[in-house]
């Protein structure tokens, strides 16, 4: 196997974050690392940093989820949706993804990994707003916060939450979304940093409550 496609070894922190679910997480990482590039799910630079940049980055969000139904918008390869479903078997997940080949991958992995808490929907978020009612919604690397608000809020129950993974500019995105925040009645909007002191690349989340 060419060196640039070798899959990163799991970091020690993975075991503490996944607990008894570690074998399932390890199998998912193996599947994604060995087949993801070929299937067009991840780029050629990603296998060597699969754990640190993607899987750990995603699972750090798990403690923010509450028992109930969580939707993941634009799940893609399963980041963070499948990772969170592995870590939180007590939570039900709806993975919303419009691309057929990605949906096929997600459905295959749900069956392969034995995840009975996951439903996969081939759709865009705006197409299922009248069909589902979520307690929380997640998304990673989908769009700016201001654009995600009108896509995600209609999916969430009153009192539910947006839990959106963001980069280093999360605070600026919140500032830029002030009009959308007011229009869609979001409250308690905050940026949460996860993994500080534990990992090299922290995870930033914008969390907001739907009033």
Curated annotation (Swiss-Prot):
Q: Name one GO molecular function term.
A: rRNA (guanine-N7-)-methyltransferase activity
Q: Tell me yes or no: is Transferase among this UniProt entry's keywords.
A: yes
CDD domains xref list:
AdoMet_MTases
Keyword set includes ATP-binding: no
Q: Which InterPro entries match?
A: rRNA_ssu_MeTfrase_G, SAM-dependent_MTases_sf
Q: Which UniProt keywords apply?
A: Cytoplasm, Methyltransferase, rRNA processing, S-adenosyl-L-methionine, Transferase
GO cellular-component term (any): cytosol
Q: What class of enzyme is it?
A: transferase
Q: Where does S-adenosyl-L-methionine bind?
A: 74, 79, 125-126, 140
Subcellular localization: Cytoplasm
In terms of superkingdom, the source organism counts as Bacteria
Q: Report the EC code(s) recorded for this entry.
A: 2.1.1.-
User: What family does the Swiss-Prot or TrEMBL record give for this protein?
Assistant: Belongs to the methyltransferase superfamily. RNA methyltransferase RsmG family.
Role played: Specifically methylates the N7 position of guanine in position 518 of 16S rRNA.
Q: Which PANTHER family match?
A: S-ADENOSYL-L-METHIONINE-DEPENDENT METHYLTRANSFERASES SUPERFAMILY PROTEIN
Alphabetized NCBIfam families for the sequence: rsmG_gidB (TIGR00138)
Task: Please give the name of this protein.
Answer: Ribosomal RNA small subunit methyltransferase G
Organism per entry:
Clavibacter sepedonicus
